[in-house]
């Protein structure tokens, strides 16, 4: 989620090189992460792991797709439930990762959620209870094109946006400024295609946000949205954030005092388990067209952003792969809290 505005001088130095690297459209397929970080999973490796989870646990896990990226990659979707082949009307939870290309630790977070709830179902009573009483949806790669581009070659590119060309020679829209609720309303995104926070030519202009939003829309039945809670994982800063991002007001249009109090309560309880700081999104900086505002403003889904490890720019977006296990399991208790809030 981190914008160039908030990141300060470090990202300012990197932005020029990243934008220059993005002026020539190309579909990148990464063989692996840069040397030393091979413990991270490429898009192909994530897909293989998801296929294994579904094959090894066919009763509780189903792998499908919500659609395709600009370059044609499947936006993989995993459903986890005690009877995954059926639609039983249980409360649903959604986890999304990797809206921003360079935030690879988030993909590992979603993969960890899938593996934890499938591998642990038979032996862990807590996991079994959560799976039996809910439907858990996981989208590990919302922006696979950008992620693959970011790791193509020998070095990281600090790439944030997707890879659809815009305005002739520029590439990419910030997917987390492209959602339809209050899109472009409040000086929380950019109209400049060269900007890291470029919001796109219109709300939902990008195939990735179109696909995920269509899926969420499809979970509404009989006037009721089945998805009750949601986390969108980002890096970095170690924060738990809730709506609204487009306004600094705690309450007002679309948010009652009671609703805000629930966001605050759940956010603080989750933060108490992982040591993150809990706050309203706009307390960090104002954003418009972000996923949390859309989830809540459109569907009344209790939607949070987790800004994962680390707290600062070193190692910033690229923590070493030996940190993956520690920083993903760090969020286990918070994930469980969010699932239990789906009711």
Report each predicted region and the residues it spans:
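Extracytoplasmic/secreted envelope proteins and their assembly/folding machinery
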Residues: 43, 47-51, 110-114, 172, ...
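Soluble secreted/lumenal catalytic domains
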Residues: 29-33, 47, 51-55, 79, ...
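Secretory targeting and sorting signals
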Residues: 1-30
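Short beta-strand-to-loop junctions in surface cap/lid or active-site-entrance loops
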Residues: 77-87, 98
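Active-site/substrate-binding loop(s) of hydrolase catalytic cores
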Residues: 90, 104-108, 112-251, 312
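Loop/turn elements at helix/coil->beta-strand transitions in domains of secreted/extracellular proteins
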Residues: 58-62, 73-75, 89-93, 132-137, ...
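C-terminal accessory segments enriched in acidic
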Residues: 3-8, 32-36, 189-343
